[in-house]
Design a protein with these regions (language model features):
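Class II aminoacyl-tRNA synthetase catalytic cores and aaRS-like
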Residues: 1-609
Length: 609
């Protein structure tokens, strides 16, 4: 039966005690990690969020009732213990931060009993993630998860302090917003008082932070909840946290400079990693040409080589055909892989096909000097030699080629480069490589919609030297946009914003909006722009992803207290869930027959379980 802690006051967390406290009377509280009865002496490992501390219960120190309670302790019981801190002498436990001491108990209260947990509460659990997430409140007790969330809290506190010291104001923006196009799918919230109308949950505070600059607030930041109704993967969630900032009277270099100092401080003070400044910069074009990606992992080489000029006149129709159709031929050199078995090469070909390749051409430069190739019979000896030389090929190398439209070639080789690096285990795990990628295209062409779409968003400023191309060649216009990359992950991105209403109107026009449509969606912003707008720019970090990389884990679910799974559901509280019919009627919502059937089938399955 649970006891009250009335009259007891916790004096320390477990790992706040050390040899300096020997002889003191203390009170600690927490969960029983494990209990061992050694015939008259009971050893209990007590756990709280700080760590573990050993407690000793012995008849000579505690009354009979207290010892009887200690005998009944089980894992995850919540207890309060008062006792004397003692040195463990020569029996130090090097595995514990408190391994040099223990507490000899003279009072105990059982504050709460526990059933046997569905999995052990221990570090590096092998328990299936589905079970862990169903009982997330137990999973959150595990030391490695607690470590991640404590780090998350420290990083958030550091960011707040740094930006406040830099003159930023923390200002909250609305959660219930107007739905606007040009982004991912919105989460919609029906309005009861405006039947048939909907709010949208924010995908970012973009418009409001720009309005704050119009309002004269100069430097704004917010650690904001954002929402996107999209398919999930390891580093995505339907609700996510963004470190959002905006600055007035600045250009690209100003935003980069303050964020470099923020990153340096953040990594040094939380995980002890030195970030060298200035961080390397690379244009979008260079990143794509060298790495096939706008978020390149620069911890290893294996860069792409453009061999279009070398093979534009050759006997291999796949190469020449791609070039004639406006594409290119590029390759990567997998050093030391010349002896790779055919089965593994075939697997790489299939991998390339997943990213749009029709195939993958290869040359094996074997250790004995033999050359094996999927296309050598179509090439002359001189053509093959020129191609191998262009790739820097040597004995023992495997050369892999893609020939297609540039978009496909980059996608295929960029992903193949990463896959090979993982297979060869050549990516240094303890290295943190930062990179700014700049000068993105302002637009990208959507074959599906047969129009230009904004690569970032419709409020991104074109580079001044490209403004005259907006009418004549929009596809070649570069944006004053920048992403910050860490080890092949985009951890943040931003841009200089358009602050002239004529350029903003031109941007909407190029995106296929009529003037009426633009004002219908963004009229409040465009009206605000008529009242004096400072030049402004900003940046936002994906906070969950940033902490994931700092913590060295593979999924952002490991750094979020209560995450969703891939179908955007919560396994712990079963959200989303059906709601009462009267709630829907109040909102003027009626379910389709198909939805009704799915709900009734789901209910039948649940009752069967």
């Amino acid at each position: 039966m649970a006891e009250s802690m009335k009259g007891m006051h916790r004096t320390h967390r477990c790992t706040e005690l050390s040899a300096a406290n020997v002889g003191e009377k203390v009170t600690v509280m927490g969960w029983v990690q494990k209990s061992r009865n050694k015939g008259g002496i009971i050893f209990v490992d007590l756990r709280d969020r700080s760590g573990i501390l050993q407690i000793i219960f012995e008849g000579k120190d505690i009354d009979e009732a207290g010892f009887a309670k200690a005998e009944k302790l089980r894992s995850e019981y919540v207890i309060a213990v008062t006792g004397i801190v003692e040195s463990r002498g020569g029996q130090v436990n090097e595995n514990l931060a408190t391994g040099a001491i223990e507490i000899r108990a003279n009072d105990i209260r059982v504050l709460s009993e526990s059933e046997t947990p569905p999995f052990p509460i221990e570090e590096n659990s092998k328990t299936k993630e589905e079970l862990r997430l169903k009982y997330r409140y137990l999973d959150l007790r595990r030391p490695d998860i607690q470590k991640n969330l404590i780090m998350r809290s420290k990083v958030a506190t550091l960011i707040r302090q740094f930006l406040s010291d830099e003159g930023f104001l923390e200002i909250e923006t609305p959660i219930l917003n107007k739905s606007t196009p040009e982004g991912a799918r919105d989460y919609l919230v029906p309005s009861r008082v405006h039947p048939g109308e909907f709010y949208a949950l924010p995908q970012s505070p973009q418009l409001f932070k720009q309005l704050l600059m119009v309002s004269g607030y100069d430097r704004y930041f917010q650690i904001a909840k954002c929402f996107r109704d999209e398919d999930l993967r390891a580093d995505r969630q339907p609700e996510f946290t963004q470190v959002d900032m905006e600055l007035s009277f600045v250009d690209v270099d100003d935003v980069i400079e303050v964020n470099e100092r923020l990153l340096k401080k953040m990594f040094k003070e939380t995980i002890g990693v030195e970030v060298s400044l200035p961080i390397q910069r690379m244009t979008y074009k260079e990143a794509m040409d060298r790495f096939g990606s706008d978020k390149p992992d620069t911890r290893f080489g294996m860069e792409l080589t453009d061999v279009t000029e070398v093979v534009k006149v050759c006997g291999f129709g796949v190469f020449t055909g791609a070039i004639e159709n406006g594409g290119s031929v590029r390759g990567i050199n997998a050093k030391g892989c010349g002896q790779m078995p055919r089965k593994k090469i075939d697997a790489l070909v299939n991998f390339a096909k997943d990213f749009g390749a029709k195939g993958l051409a290869y040359i094996q430069l074997q250790d004995d000097g033999n050359v094996k190739s999927s296309f050598a019979k179509f090439m002359t000896e001189d053509e093959m030699k020129a191609l191998i030389d262009a790739m820097g090929g040597e004995k023992g190398d495997l050369l892999l080629f893609a020939a297609d439209k540039n978009k496909v070639v980059f996608d295929v080789l960029g992903n193949l480069r990463l896959e090979l690096a993982k297979q060869l285990d050549i990516i240094p795990k303890d290295k943190f490589n930062f990179l700014w990628v700049t000068e993105f295209p302002l637009f990208e062409w959507s074959e599906e919609e047969n129009r230009y779409t904004a690569m970032h968003h419709p409020f991104t400023m074109p580079m001044e030297e490209d403004l005259d191309k907006l009418d004549t060649d929009p596809g070649s216009v570069r944006a004053k946009a920048y992403d910050i990359i860490l080890n092949g992950n985009e951890i943040g991105g931003g841009s200089v914003r358009i602050h002239q209403d004529d350029i903003q109107e031109k941007m909407f026009e190029k995106l296929g909006f009529t003037k009426e449509e633009a004002y219908s969606q963004f009229g409040f912003l465009m009206t605000a722009f008529k009242y004096g707008v400072p030049p402004h720019a900003g940046l936002a970090y994906g906070f969950d992803r940033l902490v994931m990389l700092m913590a060295g884990v593979d999924s952002i679910r490991e750094v979020i207290a209560f995450p969703k799974v891939k179908d955007a559901s919560c396994l712990m509280c079963n959200a989303p869930s059906p709601v009462a019919k009267n709630q829907l009627e109040e909102l003027g919502i009626e379910l389709t027959e198909e939805a009704e059937e799915e709900l009734s089938e789901g209910g039948a399955e649940e009752s069967a379980e």
